[in-house]
Curated annotation (Swiss-Prot):
Residues 1-54 form the ClpX-type ZB domain. It comes from Streptococcus pyogenes serotype M12 (strain MGAS2096). ATP-dependent specificity component of the Clp protease. It directs the protease to specific substrates. Can perform chaperone functions in the absence of ClpP. Zn(2+) binds at residues 13, 16, 35, 38. GO terms for molecular function: ATP binding; ATP hydrolysis activity; ATP-dependent protein folding chaperone; protein dimerization activity; unfolded protein binding; zinc ion binding. GO terms for cellular component: HslUV protease complex. The keyword Zinc-finger does not apply. This is ATP-dependent Clp protease ATP-binding subunit ClpX.
């Protein structure tokens, strides 16, 4: 029951002692009363405590070596990229912690958002997810191809922020220290070096819209998503401390790098560098190449950390299948163990799975579907076959030439 009187008897707040005449509203409970002022004060106390918890978390940011150790437990290969990400993430949250306690005359530290470049299935999304999980911060993923600039049919860039707020259970202060990964960023690059005279709905316009939230602004986000409407309540969120990681395959950027490096070889200058055909051009990418690919200079400037990921080799994919803490082979072994069955993969079978993933150009993300294809019938039949004690996956089974080998009691 809420009100200022209870059966016309004068009531007082049980917490501050003020009467109903001294406050705007008194809420009655079971033999207890609370005024609107104490409710507001309680909300402030809770908000401050939650904020202190967030700040306390930031003071315990793992050091780069510790972050790298975590990544090594889950991510195979990509050593240079993992090292670059570990340093960038550590510096970002060190900056956030420093900014909270800085004096006005201290050095103003700029954000160091991250651009990840690498082929499909090389681990870009998984790296970002693993970092967010290890830091215990809210994490959201967005697809750049679904975004359009304001006024066009599609998703506003502010909806990316809503996903982060939702991941933080609508705790805005916690969301303001989260991580957002924007995938397929290369798909909104301008095609070619000539600027189109027509309006670029999903290209440069989206880059400009993303630029505002990436560099740091107070954005108004519709609580239910969708387009903004007049008189609609908005959630205000400051993006200055949100770490943005953007990624894409950037198919063809190696040719841009080769062309740039090749131009230096053609001349007669003594500082010309010799290009090794076997060298990794991905590690040679600079801002000039990314701009030539089609991202605007202002956008590139807000992504000072560039982490290049390599195409995964057969040996890398085999390690991914077996080594990480959550390796797929371990997962399927655990699944069958619940039925009392041992699962074994022949070495040749693992090589066949990795080869298939490379042929399909799906990288690590295609490994699970290949195992599912191979084991579908087995996982269907095993629960009903109580005499089976072991399943062995062979190369022939992966290639569809025979069924997995079953051993019975």
């Amino acid at each position: 029951m809420a009100g200022s009187r209870t059966n016309d008897i004068k009531v007082y707040c049980s917490f501050c002692g003020k009467s109903q005449d001294d406050v705007k509203k008194i809420i009655a409970g079971n033999n207890v009363f609370i005024c609107n002022e104490c409710v507001a004060l309680s909300q402030e106390i809770i908000k401050e405590e939650l904020s202190e918890e967030v700040l306390a978390d930031l003071t315990e940011v793992p050091k780069p070596k510790e972050l790298l150790d975590v990544l090594n437990q889950y991510v195979v290969g990509q050593d240079r990229a993992k090292r670059a990400l570990s340093v960038a993430v550590y510096n970002h949250y060190k900056r956030v912690s420093f900014t909270e306690s800085r004096d006005d005359d201290d050095v103003d530290l700029q954000k160091s958002n991250i651009l990840m470049i690498g082929p499909t299935g090389s681990g870009k999304t998984f790296l970002a997810q693993t970092l967010a999980k290890s830091l215990n911060v809210p994490f959201a993923i967005a697809d750049a191809t679904s975004l359009t600039e304001a006024g066009y049919v599609g998703e506003d860039v502010e909806n990316i922020l809503l996903k982060l707020i939702q991941a933080a259970d609508y705790n805005v202060e916690r969301a303001e220290r989260g991580i957002i990964y924007v995938d397929e960023i290369d798909k909104i690059a301008k095609k070619g070096e000539n600027v189109s005279i027509t309006r670029d709905v999903s290209g440069e316009g989206v880059q400009q819209a993303l630029l505002k939230i990436i560099e740091g602004t107070v954005a108004s986000v519709p609580p239910q998503g969708g387009r903004k409407h007049p008189n609609q309540e908005m959630i205000q969120i400051d993006t200055k401390n949100i770490l943005f990681i953007v990624g894409g395959a950037f198919d063809g950027i190696e040719e841009i790098v080769k062309q740039r490096l090749g131009e230096k070889v053609i001349g007669f200058g003594q500082n010309s560098r010799k290009i090794d055909d076997n060298a990794s051009y991905m590690q040679e990418i600079i801002s000039e190449d990314i701009q030539k690919f089609g991202l605007i200079p202002e956008f590139i400037g807000r992504l000072p950390v560039v982490a290049a990921l390599e195409q995964l080799k057969t040996s890398d994919l085999i390690r991914i299948l077996t080594e990480p803490r959550n390796a797929l082979v371990k997962q399927y072994q655990a699944l069958l163990s619940y039925d009392g069955v041992e699962l074994e993969f022949d070495k040749a079978a693992l090589e066949a799975i990795a080869t298939k993933a490379i042929e399909r150009k799906t990288g690590a993300r295609g490994l699970r579907s290949i195992i599912e294809e191979t084991m579908l019938d087995i996982m269907f039949e095993i629960p009903s076959q109580e005499d089976v004690t072991k399943v062995r996956i062979t190369k022939a089974a992966v290639e569809g030439k025979s069924k997995p080998v079953l051993e019975t009691a």
